C-alpha cells in the first residue's frame, strides 16, 4: 500500500482504525473517534513552556560546590535524558505518522514529539549554564558505554518498525529481495512490530526517566540545583501526558475495540511485552548502580532507587494489562510525589517560576460589578 500525504478518496474518519486504514486527508477536529487524544492535545498545548523562562544561574554556583561523586550523578543523568528525548523528539513522527489513519491521533503524535524537542533544548540550557564547554558533555553521549547499553534497547523497536513500514509502502505484502536480503512483508507482522514498538515507548515514558527525575528532585530537597529541578518538574508533567497517550493506544489495541486482530496480537506478544518491561527495569537498576558507584547522596541511594523502579514498574505494567513482576507495593520515596504532582505545592508567584501555570486557560470576561469597589 503506497503512502500518500493527501488521499483524495472520500472516507468517514469515524470508521477508520487508529492505524493501517486510509491515510489521513483532511485534518478536522470537529469530530473525534477517540476524544481522549483531543483532550491530550489541548492539555499539552496549555502546558507550553520554554526552558529560558526558568532561571538556572544559581545552579552554576551549586554545581561547582558539589563533591565529585554528586557531579557525576548530576551530569550523567542529563546525558541520559538528552539521549532519551533526542530519540523521542523525532521517532514518534517518523515511525507512527505513516501508519496513522485518524486526525486526532496524528495531531497528538506531532504535539507529543514537539514537546520532546523542548525537553532536549532544556538539557542544553542547563548544561550550557553549568559547564564551560558543553561539547565535552554532549560528545560523550554517543561513546558512553552505560548510555549505549540503554540506547539499543530503546531504538531497536523503532528501527524495525520503520524498516518494515518502508517495505510495506514501497513493495507491498509478499516475499521480496532487497539488497541481496530476502524480506517477507505481511500486514500482521507489521501490526505486531507496531504493538511491540508502542509497548517499548510506553516503557520508556513509564520507567526510564524516573531514576534521573528522583536524583534531580533529591538535590532540590537540599536546596541545590533548584533551577534544574524546576525544569525537570515541567518535563515530568509532560511525560505523564505522553505516558497516558501510549497507555490509551495500547489499551484500545489490546481490547480489540479498534482492530480485532490487534487483540490476538496483544495476547501473542504478552510474554515479550512482560520481558521488555522487566528488561527496562533492570537497565534502570543498573543505571542507578552506575550513578552511585562512587558514593550516595543525602536522601537517596542505589537500594532505595531500585525499590522505586520496582514500585513504578508494577504500576505501569498493571496499566497495560501485564502481570506484576516485583514484590514492592509501596513507594519508598513518597516525597517525590510533591514534585511529580504540580498541584501539591503552593508557592508565591513573585518568588519562583510557577510550574502549574497553564497557557490559554484564563477567563477573560469582565463584568461591571467587578469594578464596583474601585474609586478614582
Curated annotation (Swiss-Prot):
Binds 2 iron ions per subunit. It catalyses: a 2'-deoxyribonucleoside 5'-diphosphate + [thioredoxin]-disulfide + H2O = a ribonucleoside 5'-diphosphate + [thioredoxin]-dithiol. Provides the precursors necessary for DNA synthesis. Catalyzes the biosynthesis of deoxyribonucleotides from the corresponding ribonucleotides. R2 contains the tyrosyl radical required for catalysis. InterPro entries: Ferritin-like_SF, RNR-like, RNR_small, RNR_small_AS, RNR_small_fam. The active site is at 123. Its cofactor is Fe cation. Keywords: Deoxyribonucleotide synthesis, Iron, Metal-binding, Oxidoreductase. GO terms for molecular function: identical protein binding; iron ion binding; ribonucleoside-diphosphate reductase activity, thioredoxin disulfide as acceptor. One of its GO terms (biological process) is nucleobase-containing small molecule interconversion. Disulfide bonds: none annotated. Fe cation 2 binds at residues 116, 205, 239, 242. E.coli produces two separate class I enzymes. This one is the functional enzyme during growth. Fe cation 1 binds at residues 85, 116, 119. Induction: Induced 4.2-fold by hydroxyurea (at protein level). It comes from Escherichia coli (strain K12). This is Ribonucleoside-diphosphate reductase 1 subunit beta. The gene is nrdB.
